[in-house]
Amino acid sequence: MVFVSDSSISLPIWDAPRARGPIVSDLAIPGSKSITNRALILAALASTPSTIIDVLRSRDTDLMTDGLRSLGITITEEAVDRYRVEPGQLSAGSVECGLAGTVMRFLPPVAAFADGPVHFDGDPQARVRPMTSILDALRSLGVEVDNNNLPFTVNAGEVPEGGVVEIDASGSSQFVSGLLLSAPRFKNGVTVKHVGGRLPSMPHIEMTVDMLRSAGIEIEESENQWVVHPGEILGRTWRIEPDLSNATPFLAAAAVTGGTIKINHWPIKTTQPGDAIRSILERMGCEVELVAQGEGYDLSVTGPVALKGIEIDMSDIGELTPTVAALAALASTESRLTGIAHLRGHETDRLAALTAEINKLGGKCTELKDGLLIEPASLHGGVWHSYADHRMATAGAIIGLAVDDVQVEDIKTTSKTFPGFENVWEEMVG
């Protein structure tokens, strides 16, 4: 389902800056949303307090923080990017999910440990996002849930026993991660078995498993199965990596303009799907280099004279699709992006939305059963709709670098994961 703008509502239009030459810039990117929200969940369920450093402040992370506070967790802001989290007895409350998949899918299992009912709701678009898999899984674990989509109420009564749960997570890896994060608190732990089609975004599940192990939890993995043993989640200090997916539009600026972009503090070892942008840009003709800087590394990308298209299975890195699709629309040869049928259930139907917006600007994008075929075409200006989707908005900004008179509707939807994106972007373009 694609959400289009209501003609009765006037959304602000942002004139995407056009690059007049190669862009050269050195940038620091805020912390990872995915890691921040996982750290908040683990800190809330831990046996002792935790400190989270380099927290991302965005709509999604603020919704997670507010949701945990509504359940009785004390979260103290020691600095703008540093939180102290003190766990305690979870209480009845109300959670506003917005459009945050991590909130609507990670917090319902947490709510199973509250001493009363927990009500969930979100933005209108959130009410059609897939939720049945995780809610049915909670029911099979003995948790009462009164609906299959937002709004719904979770009411456990007493600490659930846990056990084996079968789940079809082919629509989103967040269904698996949501169960795994809370699994140690169930009396007998939880065994999660994925029984559906191909599981997307495996790096996000690997991120969840890695963070659980870092908090002292024992997990056994096999193909499409995770056995989480019951135990205390240890309080600790979490340091959040830069959000590599949010870095990709800026690296795309180098690719599009033949410039050089350097992203500070790029992690050498990471479970973030955004790290795949390095190999993608190399295949599209860019020079990509990790440059030693102090105790860490910066990532430097220099764009080519002519950007090449790419054929790639993006099933594990679906969140990069809007960035790669924007690059493909500006490339000199054909691109085929596959393995991303699950994007139809994201903030919007991203495949339909990308197809509509690229073609509206004169592009040649065809929606496939599980992806996109994008052929070279001469683009022109026009309004690029964001569909209240942060990554759709940044895709429009990328195209605007190379095409005159591109206007992005509701650029501030990027505040979901990157508040102030448009200011950083304009400063980069100069």
From Swiss-Prot:
Record CDD domains: EPSP_synthase
Organism: Corynebacterium glutamicum (strain R)
PANTHER family membership: AROM/DEHYDROQUINATE SYNTHASE, PENTAFUNCTIONAL AROM POLYPEPTIDE
Entry binding sites for 3-phosphoshikimate: K33, S34, R38, S172, S173, Q174, S201, E319, H346
Catalytic activity: 3-phosphoshikimate + phosphoenolpyruvate = 5-O-(1-carboxyvinyl)-3-phosphoshikimate + phosphate
GO biological processes: amino acid biosynthetic process; aromatic amino acid family biosynthetic process; chorismate biosynthetic process
Enzyme nomenclature, EC number: 2.5.1.19
Keyword annotations from UniProtKB, A to Z: Amino-acid biosynthesis, Aromatic amino acid biosynthesis, Cytoplasm, Transferase
Position of the signal peptide: none
UniProt-listed Pfam families: EPSP_synthase
InterPro entries (alphabetical): Enolpyruvate_Tfrase_dom, Enolpyruvate_Tfrase_sf, EPSP_synthase, EPSP_synthase_CS, RNA3'P_cycl/enolpyr_Trfase_a/b
Complexes and interactors: Monomer.
Role summary: Catalyzes the transfer of the enolpyruvyl moiety of phosphoenolpyruvate (PEP) to the 5-hydroxyl of shikimate-3-phosphate (S3P) to produce enolpyruvyl shikimate-3-phosphate and inorganic phosphate.
Protein name according to UniProt: 3-phosphoshikimate 1-carboxyvinyltransferase
One term of GO molecular function: 3-phosphoshikimate 1-carboxyvinyltransferase activity
Protein residues bound to phosphoenolpyruvate: K33, G101, R129, Q174, R350, R391, K416
GO-annotated cellular components: cytoplasm
Family: Belongs to the EPSP synthase family.
Residue numbers annotated as active site: E319
Pathway involvement of the protein, from the record: Metabolic intermediate biosynthesis; chorismate biosynthesis; chorismate from D-erythrose 4-phosphate and phosphoenolpyruvate: step 6/7
